[in-house]
């Protein structure tokens, strides 16, 4: 069973975000080195753990883009990727619409990250 759980545990967040198979895909030229990364903990930022049958599979981070729109960032651990990844995003969308004021979810996908683009499209997101 897939669950989504809000967290403010800095160590857990950091361990996922700076993972060698995640950080290079979510950082940019102005990001700190992974060893210097510190997550921002604030009520306006939702750090959401993904668990599958109790096993930690990664996290989603959402933050407000405007009054009804949130921006999504996805960090799925390599051992949990594959066919179940779309289940994680669908569960996330349910969580967002049940627990926040947001009515729309957006994400930005760099051109080099084809796996993220496939996940977004399989999860029902559309290009705008």
What are these regions (language model features)?
Residues 31-37:
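Short, basic/aromatic recognition patches
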Residues 82-96, 118, 122:
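Conserved acetyl-CoA-binding loop-helix of GNAT-fold acetyltransferases
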Residues 49, 54-63, 70-71:
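Conserved beta-strand in the GNAT
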Residues 1-31:
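Short amphipathic alpha-helix that is part of the acyltransferase structural core
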Residues 106-118:
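Conserved beta-strand-loop-alpha-helix junction that forms the acyl-donor binding cleft
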Residues 67-79, 108-110:
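Conserved acetyl-CoA binding element of GNAT-fold acetyltransferases
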């Amino acid at each position: 069973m897939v669950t989504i759980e809000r967290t403010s545990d800095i160590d857990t967040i950091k361990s996922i975000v700076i993972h060698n198979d995640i950080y290079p895909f979510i950082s940019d030229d102005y990001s700190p080195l992974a060893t210097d990364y510190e997550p921002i903990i604030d009520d306006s930022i939702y750090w959401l753990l993904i668990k599958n049958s109790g096993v930690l599979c990664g996290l989603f981070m959402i933050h407000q883009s405007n009054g009804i729109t949130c921006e999504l960032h996805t960090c799925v651990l390599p051992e949990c990727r594959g066919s179940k990844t779309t289940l994680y995003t669908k569960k996330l969308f349910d969580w967002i619409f049940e627990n926040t004021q947001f009515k729309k979810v957006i994400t930005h996908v760099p051109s080099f990250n084809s796996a993220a683009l496939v996940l977004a499209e399989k999860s029902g997101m559309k290009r705008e």
